[in-house]
Amino acid sequence: IHPNIDTPIADGIANTLDYLAHHWQDQPSLEHLAARAGWSLSHFQRAFTEHVGVSPKRVLQFLTIAHARDRLQDGASLLDTALDSGLSGPGRLHNLFVAIEAMTPGEYKTHGAALTITYGCAQSLFGPVLLGVTPRGICWLAFAKPDVSEAAEAEFHIEWALSQRIRDDRAVQPILDHALDHWRGHGTTSGLG
């Protein structure tokens, strides 16, 4: 949360984040979250997004997918993972994985077997990053400072050990640039996971 915001707004956002951390499996609606904060829907969405940096829906998606990834890594079925993650079924789980991870839950569960991931180093505002990209968008992003770049790349290869990995630094830079433009509000969402 931005350090220079009014206390009532900061308190409302902090309370919402705490609520989401404890009730994400209920998949609360934006309307429910705004009502809990005592704000109008539009004010809540705008204030939350401005001060947190992402929308309440995106925070909920991140919390949900973190749990779903853990369940899949533990060997749970797609149906059990979806239901245990507060989703209505495997279709919602599929959509969430494609939107956030740029791959299906099945591809994630198998560490990318039958998946081609193009990866490489690209330059960002925060320094070099190691970027992994599937045909659906970005699936991996790790800061790759000189002292940790080998470790970041080793972790990438372990995570996606069963995928076909193709190193192409020149191919990933425009994808990162496009993503950064989108995140700054200057681009479209095509090609982004």
Question: How would you label these PLM feature ranges?
Answer:
Residues 1-85, 91-193:
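Basic nucleic-acid-binding alpha-helical/helix-turn surface characteristic of O6-alkylguanine DNA
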